[in-house]
Amino acid sequence: MSAIIDYKNVEVLRKELLVLKNVNFQLEEGQFVYLIGRVGSGKSSLMKTMYAEVPIEMGEARIFDYDLSAIRRKDVPMLRRQIGVVFQDFQLLSDRSVYDNLLFVLKATGWKNKTDIDERINEVL
């Protein structure tokens, strides 16, 4: 079985500070992982690299067939649809309805067709 997530010697800088150094791991289909650690240990930065929100400075990182160090902006929504992420502190937008909060997330992940969006939101609600 081949890895669906494969990180080799990954390094990440945030505001010129090295926050991840020499990260190496593989995750195969059906496996899962918990990221735990002290505040400031790089957990969120690592997750944000997987979500293509934080760039990889050095090394190689692949999720499915996406090279995270060279992913095209137009491919990011498709990548994000394939990844299940549970954020520690997720906040709804308090000035919006539940429908509008879900609409915001779907649009942010690349959904464009209004009929498909409405169907998906109605499934969830």
Please identify what each model-predicted range represents.
Residues 36-38:
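The feature captures the beta-strand-to-loop junction immediately N-terminal to the Walker
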Residues 51:
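Helix-to-loop junction immediately C-terminal to a conserved catalytic motif
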Residues 59-67:
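Conserved ABC transporter NBD signature motif
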Residues 66-67, 115-125:
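Conserved ABC ATPase "signature" region
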Residues 68-84:
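ABC ATPase NBD coupling module
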Residues 95-104:
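Short coil-to-helix segment of the ABC ATPase nucleotide-binding domain corresponding to the Q-loop/switch region
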Residues 103-116:
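ABC-type ATPase nucleotide-binding domains, specifically the catalytic core motifs of the NBD
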